[in-house]
């Protein structure tokens, strides 16, 4: 079990490329933290600095109150799982899982106990005598997890461990890793570019862009209360719809749209002196409904109708704006069809058009 403190962490390479900028985070014992962001945002570099595989250029890394900046990787009581399984093809599953313990000269009976315990948790008991070549991708990834588990480390680090798996296996392994966290009851830090993995697995999500932390929070918090337009657009699939306009009286207006703003949101906008200034309204696809209400109804034309099974994703044109609408599958929708859509303005978000920071 472990608590981590990352204080003003920096990573600057010799060519002066600033990869991680003033990273601050307190991780409590038994949390499942997910670093998420686009490629090149610094998430894997941060993970590698925690592991001791990258030198920290500035700031302090503390594990259980002890400064770890200069402590070798092998002495940090950390286990790591990589995107590449890195299994020894000539060894059995048992020997792959036991290899690190053998190198530490741990007693054979202890090794046997740990390997069998991990194999039981991961459903690998019947595969212990097989070699990696005889296993599926999901089974090989479980072996890699098992190799980390047997170390009984205080912190588990995972760097995009599911990215080599197909879509069905990724869903299955997401659930297995979440169950594993519950069984081990330990601190886990997980890196991914997939916001669905972040939303479904994390206790808290750390969203990064260009080496800078954009927001830290529980999945529901970052989804419902994004700190800025980047977070709002990155978290959620399909992404949040954005419309640029201004506030005129109690209306959000563009050249072709006029939508009534709820009183509580309007009060915040007035407090922030956002009236008559360029502003961005954001609204998620599920908060635009393909049915008419008393107000905030707009005519839309469907350009693409995607049936995913339980629902439709409707790609529409609304007054010159391209908007995605999430609709139930009870009705049929077709490209070229004109529909009336309703904006649930109680669910909309407003952002400063210049800074892109959330207003309300």
Curated annotation (Swiss-Prot):
Organism the protein comes from? Escherichia coli (strain UTI89 / UPEC)
Task: For this UniProt record, give its keywords in alphabetical order, as a comma-separated list.
Answer: ATP-binding, Nucleotide-binding, Transport
Lineage: superkingdom: Bacteria
Any GO MF annotation of the entry: ATP hydrolysis activity
- List GO BP terms, alphabetically: carbohydrate transport
The answer, when asked if Ligase is one of the entry's keywords, is no
Q: What is this protein called?
A: Uncharacterized ABC transporter ATP-binding protein YcjV
**What gene codes for this chain?**
ycjV
Acetylation among the record's keywords?
no
**What's a single GO CC term here?**
ATP-binding cassette (ABC) transporter complex, substrate-binding subunit-containing
